[in-house]
């Protein structure tokens, strides 16, 4: 892959450190009064999710990681995993459940997901940032709930995600949900 110098370090840059793919989360350039300047970076491992700090002397270079993203549509799920299709080439690919555990609650058929690949192999699947989901189950809002300061109630979406929604949301309504935090954003339809 391509080598990048410390002067090219940017947040979001994908690099390879000790044979592992990382993404730069934070980059601080430090020029002490005495001694050589250096970059202190905070990186997240794509495979393990662990965040570590590394220091590089000014002018050092490291390899970029062969991490690519591909947009694919979820066709269906079964006991083995989920089958995705590329909308342009119509190629289908089965992703096993072990790679989908952290997003299982966000799997919805006919939705486009981002498959992250490292050296050609899928290492993770990322859902869209916002999804429109229908409320499958929630308790009815009772008059007087807001008097006790309670303005949110638990709800379960059609994908099985458990979220907190305002008390005026009822079963069957469609809501917009932020998949990064699992929080309610807005009502889509009534």
UniProtKB/Swiss-Prot annotation:
Transmembrane segments: none
InterPro entries tied to this protein: Elong-fact-P_C, NA-bd_OB-fold, Rib_uL2_dom2, Transl_elong_fac_P/YeiP, Transl_elong_KOW-like, Transl_elong_P/YeiP_cen, Transl_elong_P/YeiP_CS, Transl_elongation_fac_P
GO biological process terms held by the UniProt record: peptide biosynthetic process
Keyword flag Cytoplasm: yes
Pathway this chain belongs to: Protein biosynthesis; polypeptide chain elongation
Subcellular location: Cytoplasm
GO CC entries: cytoplasm
Gene3D superfamilies according to UniProt: 2.30.30.30, Nucleic acid-binding proteins
Pfam families tied to this protein: EFP, EFP_N, Elong-fact-P_C
Keywords carried by this UniProt record: Cytoplasm, Elongation factor, Protein biosynthesis
GO molecular function, one term: translation elongation factor activity
HAMAP family registered for this protein in UniProt: EF_P (MF_00141)
Record-linked NCBIfam families: efp, PRK00529.1
The family this protein is said to belong to: Belongs to the elongation factor P family.
PANTHER family cross-referenced by the UniProt entry: ELONGATION FACTOR P, ELONGATION FACTOR P (EF-P) FAMILY PROTEIN
Role description: Involved in peptide bond synthesis. Stimulates efficient translation and peptide-bond synthesis on native or reconstituted 70S ribosomes in vitro. Probably functions indirectly by altering the affinity of the ribosome for aminoacyl-tRNA, thus increasing their reactivity as acceptors for peptidyl transferase.
Name of the featured protein: Elongation factor P 2
Organism of derivation: Chlamydia muridarum (strain MoPn / Nigg)
């Amino acid at each position: 892959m391509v080598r990048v110098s410390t002067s090219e370090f940017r947040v979001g840059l994908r690099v390879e450190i000790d044979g592992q793919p990382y993404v730069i989360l934070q980059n601080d350039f430090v020029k002490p009064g005495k001694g050589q300047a250096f970059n202190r970076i905070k990186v997240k491992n794509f495979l393990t999710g662990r965040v570590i700090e590394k220091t590089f002397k000014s002018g050092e270079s490291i390899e970029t990681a062969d991490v690519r993203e591909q947009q694919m549509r979820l066709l269906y799920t079964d006991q083995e995993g989920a089958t995705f299709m590329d909308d342009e080439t119509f190629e289908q690919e089965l992703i096993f459940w072990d790679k989908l555990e952290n997003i299982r609650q966000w799997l919805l058929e006919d939705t486009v997901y981002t498959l992250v690949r490292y050296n050609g192999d899928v290492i993770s699947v990322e859902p869209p940032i916002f999804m429109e989901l229908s409320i499958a189950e929630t308790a009815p809002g009772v008059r007087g709930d807001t008097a006790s300061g309670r303005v949110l109630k638990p709800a379960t979406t059609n994908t099985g995600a458990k979220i907190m929604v305002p008390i005026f949301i009822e079963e069957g309504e469609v809501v917009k949900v932020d998949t990064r935090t699992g929080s309610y954003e807005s009502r889509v339809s009534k």
